[in-house]
Amino acid sequence: MFPNLNHRMLSVVDLFAGVGGLSEGFARARTDGKPIYELRLLVDKDPEAALTYRTNRPGIPYLVEDISNVAQKDILSKARVRKGDLDILIGGPPCQGFSVLRRNRALDDPRNEMMRVFLRFVRGLRPRLFMIENVPNLLVAAEGKFWREIRDFVSENYIVKAAILNACDYGVPQWRKRTFIVGFRKDLGVDDFSFPFVEETRKISPKQLTPHLGDEELLPIIRPWISTEEAIGDLPSLRPGGEASFYTQEPFTDYQAARRKDSRILANHIARRHDEKFLQKLSKIEEGGSNQELDGRRRFDRGREIKYLSQAYGRLHRKGIAQTITAHFLNPGSGRFTHYRDLRSITVREGARFQSFDDDFVFYGKMQSQQRLVGNAVPPLMARALAEYFGSMMLGQ
């Protein structure tokens, strides 16, 4: 099916790379203990994302440029491949027009033009496989019209499938549903393929993890869920405005140990400041609770015409699972981002833990920029699971 591919590492180009969550997953992917992929090039117009990635991974080329202004021949040149020889093209083109709050705006939203830009690179570069990560609503936007447009745009040369996957099924301690679109080039002889996912996503409560399926019922790639405490419980306790640069206890879960690796210094563990009046009100929310569970006099949206979302000012539960980490998780009012133990919002490092970044991956820039980079990233462990699954297919294993 894929002649000669099992004798070399597979080449990868990442467009709309951001801080490199997808690329991190592909870089971590292994088969028989050996790396599967070689990252040839990352491209994004965000200089802050580039600074963070280049500092962490200085040996991998990162082009800071608006991809819509980059010629396809330049991508091939910088990635050191010829047209048709690139193994995998990956990316998460921004499509904010498909977010839950904007589900009625799809094809007419100019922010969704970047999806078409990515697909033009698929046509022009002709990779053996392409993978797109995006928001779940992409598949239903405009009554499915945009998804059909994506499929039809490349269907002449690719077998294309899509699935909505949940990060918590792949070792990521976070409830995060995302759409993945994968296409195999038809001349490779792939008649059909599937995604590694459970038919019905396991159910949870915001407060308490429900029992996951027994391991014998799971595909090998599917992992038991990881609770909030299992993910971040080893990180030092902080007061608002406080910070910690060193670990104060040993990891007590495999997940914590894996994220630490050999790290000795703790980066990005700085708590946002909150005023006393705000903290007094926040203290009334119990572990696992939210603003909606407060009585009328105590609610944060008291007297407001527009009521807050159900997860606003939500507090994590140590035995529960983190909700979707967004680009605004330093703000307790934007979701369930208040620490279960400490009276504060979670830190950038805790957000990165929920996203499955290793502790030695340091985020640079102002805190507001750091939270954006973390929240917009593809969880590396989720990317790794898919990279290993499809990589094994390409290598005939």
Q: What kind of feature is each model-predicted range?
A:
Residues Q96, G189, L213, P332, ...:
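Glycine-centered loop/turn positions within well-structured domains
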Residues F2-R126, P136-V140, G144-R148:
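Core alpha/beta nucleotide-donor-binding catalytic domains of modification enzymes
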Residues G59, P196-V198, Y340-R344:
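Short Gly/aromatic-enriched secondary-structure transition segments
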